[in-house]
Amino acid sequence: MLILIRHAHVLFNWEKKYTAEGFAKAQAEYDKAPIEQIRDSQLRSIRDGLPEHFELYTSTLKRSIDTAAQLFPDKTPIQLPELSEIPIYPYRDSDKPLSLWRWLFWGRVQWFCNNPRQERTKQKVEHEIEALMSVFIENKNMVIVGHGFQMRTMLSILARRYPVQKPMHIKNLDRVKCFVYEKDQQYLSFLRTSGI
C-alpha cells in the first residue's frame, strides 16, 4: 500500500502582485519557510490510519522533511528529489507587477504544455514517476510526505495502472491511500474476491 500525506501548512504570506523576479524570489522563500506545528489530535489521527510497518519517503524540500519529522520523529525518511513539488517559474519576463494568480495559472498552463520555461516539464515529471513505480511495487507499505500538485500528478499517473482514490483537492495533512501491485495475479485475485 502507498499512502500519500501532504505537508503541513507553510507559514508564509504571499503578496497580491509580483514582478517576474519578485515571483521567483517568493517561490524560493516559500521553499525555505517553516511549517505550522501539527496538533496532537492531527498526529494521532494520521498515525492511527497507517500500517504498523512502513518505509518513509519525503521530497528534498524543507516543508516535506519538517512535516515527516513531526509526524514520525523516530523514523529517518528517504529523501527523493523526484517527490519535490513541481515548481512554477515565471511564465514570462515582466518588470510590471502582475497578480499572483496569473503567475500561478499561466505557469501551470505552460507546465501542462511542456513549455521549456517550466524546467520540470510534465513529460519529465511523468518519466520520473514512471521510474519510481518499481520502488512502489517492491515495497509492501510506503508513506510519502509530499506536495499537493505533485501528489495529484502522481495519482493521475498511478490511476492508469492501479486502483487509487483521486480526491479533487488535497489539503494540508490530507492522506490518500493507493493500492499498488502488479495487475496480473494479485489484481485479478482482488477482483475475484471483491466481486467487482
Stretches found by the model and what they are:
Residues K96-F112, Q185-I196:
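A polyampholytic, Gly/Pro-enriched intrinsically disordered region
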Residues T153-L155:
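Catalytic DNA-binding helix-loop module of base-excision-repair DNA glycosylases/AP lyases
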Residues Q70, D74, V135, I157-R161:
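Active-site catalytic microenvironments for nucleophilic, acid-base chemistry
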Residues L2-I3, F54, E138-G148:
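Generic beta-sheet signal
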Residues E82-P97:
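Signature for phosphate-centric chemistry
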Residues A8-L11, K62-S64, S84-I86, G148-M151, ...:
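Short, solvent-exposed loop/turn segments at secondary-structure junctions
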Residues M1-E82, W101-E130, L173:
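Active-site-proximal alpha-helix that buttresses catalytic centers in soluble enzyme cores
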Residues G22-K25, Y162-R192:
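Domain-level recognition of soluble alpha/beta enzyme cores
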